[in-house]
């Protein structure tokens, strides 16, 4: 079996201030960051038949991701305008392009059979795949980002081994939410807290991980890096706190340069 495949969103992040464009998106980023740990992840996503689509596929292949199921569709590749304010990213206009109609084919499902872990995020139009993937014995992971009001918290979590999210800081309200998520059926919930580290609830106890002290250049990809480091650590047999520490180290590396990768 192969370690991990991601499904769903891709996006070209366009930085007008830098006059540069970087390939990204949660599914793409997590796959790329997993290559840091010596594995070849797979990725299922849709790109347009434009220059950005060509760039994204070339970038993924260069980084060591299996692009056999990065499908090219007629239309525009997803893209986001990004500005930097005090080294933090601020998202501007977003064009979803061909990703608006994303769905897995039967052939995509068959291809995923070779992977142990499948990950997606809330923007990827991939949530409908998770009941089938979980029932097939895949370890499933999903990133809700900061969308705490999403109805997917009610419907999707019984099909998740790991539910990831983000919040500004830990407080009692957050801890209660995390307990409720696991009670609803998720295996473990992990919340990244930016400069405040991360916290996990596994149904028995809370686990906390402090951030690594580094010079921040660009926070793009920090959360995706954490997820990749965590999942690769878990698949290698790490404990929950060990996997959180590896996720933190992966994120610390990413935030020290411009762009996701």
Curated annotation (Swiss-Prot):
Pathway: Carbohydrate metabolism; fructoselysine degradation; D-glucose 6-phosphate and lysine from fructoselysine: step 1/2. PANTHER family: CARBOHYDRATE KINASE PFKB DOMAIN-CONTAINING PROTEIN, SUGAR KINASE. Catalyzes the ATP-dependent phosphorylation of fructoselysine to fructoselysine 6-phosphate. May function in a fructoselysine degradation pathway that allows S.flexneri to grow on fructoselysine or psicoselysine. Monomer. Belongs to the carbohydrate kinase PfkB family. Its EC number is 2.7.1.218. SUPFAM superfamilies: Ribokinase-like (SSF53613). InterPro entries: Carb_kinase_PfkB-like, Carboh/pur_kinase_PfkB_CS, PfkB_dom, Ribokinase-like. It is an enzyme of class 2 (transferase). Gene3D superfamilies: 3.40.1190.20. This is Fructoselysine 6-kinase. Keywords: ATP-binding, Kinase, Nucleotide-binding, Transferase. Pfam families: PfkB. The keyword Membrane does not apply. It comes from Shigella flexneri. It catalyses: N(6)-(D-fructosyl)-L-lysine + ATP = N(6)-(6-phospho-D-fructosyl)-L-lysine + ADP + H(+). One of its GO terms (molecular function) is ATP binding.
